[in-house]
Structure formats: structure tokens, C-alpha cells
């Protein structure tokens, strides 16, 4: 165990009496000046403080229920059945989202292997809903990467139509293939492109 030196003990004593509200906001929120200034573009000083404080907390663990195979209610029950220190609750905004309180080894669960859910933050889930894709449409996801949002869009399309997943990284697209296989979606078509001017994109013009 580390034994405090006299100088360290005195510093801790002084630190414990500091009023955080009296500190410079850059120090209080552990932010560089440029980022603090950028947060100032949003209305209200309280909003800026909330944004800054949120960066000091670990990211939340959110799941998206794959509605081709299950629903949120069943996924909640499945996750809560894991027991231990974990608790599953609905995400506040995304209708198919489940928030996990804790860090379980999800890759080892039956639900993950069966493609019943994807690890996906609530914001990304909401983007798919904002797009509002319809059954039978043709949709292109540029910069699809490993395909998290692509798979969310594909599920909303109920595996109909054609959903192209474009990306300039073959490595990232390769990560989409096992995820697509687990999801059960047949309307997703990963396509490598070399740029936004790739001939593969131009062939879709007017369709």
C-alpha cells in the first residue's frame, strides 16, 4: 500500500476544501479551451456544463433488439435472466433499445450468437428511425463501416428491398459479414468503393 508523504497529505487536505463551482470551468470539467468554446454554441450555460460532465462518465452499454428474431420485451427478460450484478432496462427513446447496467460478457450469450441483438448506442438506433426506410425501397448507406446502422435499417425494411452498404475500407466491411449472417437479413449488400465517384455508385443513378 502507498503511504502518503507529508506534502501529499497536506495537498489532499487543501483539495478537500475546494469548492468546485469556484474553479475555472476548464479545470472543473477537465476540457481543452477549444472544446469548451464549442459547447458554448448550444443555448444555456447549464447545457454546456451537462455536456462537459457527460464526457467524464463511461459510455452506456446499449443493445438493439433484432426485430427479425425477437422484440424488446423478450430481450429485456433474457438479459435480466443473466443475473449477477447486471440489470436491463428500456432505453428512454429508441423503441427497440435495451440499456445494460453493468458489463456482461455478451458475446458468450445464446442471444448474441443467435443474432437476437446488436450492441449499438441509442443515438445510432435513432438515426435509423429518423431515416424511416420503407419496405421494398432501395437504400444506400455511405460509410457503412462494420454495418451497425445498416443492420438497423435492414430490420426496419423487414429484409425487403435492396440495402447497399458502401465503404472505402474492405477491412471494416469484412466485419459486417458475420454480423449480417447472425442477423438473418437478406437485403443487405456490402460493396467496397474506392471513392464517392466510384462507378458502382453511378450505376445506381436514377433507380
State what each model feature region is:
Residues 1-105:
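Class I Rossmann-like S-adenosyl-L-methionine
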Amino acid at each position: 500500500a502507498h503511504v502518503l508523504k507529508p506534502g501529499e497529505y497536506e495537498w489532499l487536505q487543501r483539495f478537500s476544501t475546494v469548492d468546485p463551482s469556484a474553479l475555472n470551468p476548464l479545470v472543473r470539467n477537465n476540457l481543452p479551451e477549444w472544446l469548451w468554446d464549442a459547447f458554448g454554441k448550444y443555448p444555456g450555460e447549464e447545457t454546456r456544463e451537462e455536456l462537459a460532465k457527460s464526457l467524464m462518465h463511461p459510455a452506456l452499454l446499449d443493445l438493439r433488439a433484432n426485430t427479425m428474431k425477437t422484440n424488446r420485451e423478450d430481450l429485456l427478460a433474457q438479459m435480466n435472466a443473466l443475473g449477477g450484478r447486471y440489470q436491463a432496462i428500456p432505453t428512454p427513446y429508441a423503441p427497440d433499445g435495451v440499456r445494460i447496467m453493468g458489463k456482461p460478457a455478451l458475446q458468450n450469450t445464446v442471444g448474441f450468437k443467435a443474432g437476437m441483438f446488436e450492441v449499438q448506442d441509442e443515438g445510432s438506433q435513432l438515426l435509423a428511425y429518423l431515416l424511416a426506410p420503407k419496405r421494398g425501397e432501395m437504400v444506400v448507406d455511405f460509410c457503412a463501416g462494420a454495418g451497425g446502422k445498416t443492420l438497423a435499417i435492414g430490420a426496419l425494411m423487414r429484409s425487403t428491398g435492396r440495402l447497399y452498404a458502401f465503404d472505402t475500407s474492405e477491412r471494416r466491411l469484412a466485419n459486417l459479414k458475420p454480423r449480417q449472417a447472425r442477423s438473418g437479413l437478406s437485403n443487405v449488400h456490402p460493396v467496397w468503393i474506392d471513392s464517392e465517384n466510384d462507378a458502382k455508385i453511378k450505376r445506381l443513378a436514377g433507380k
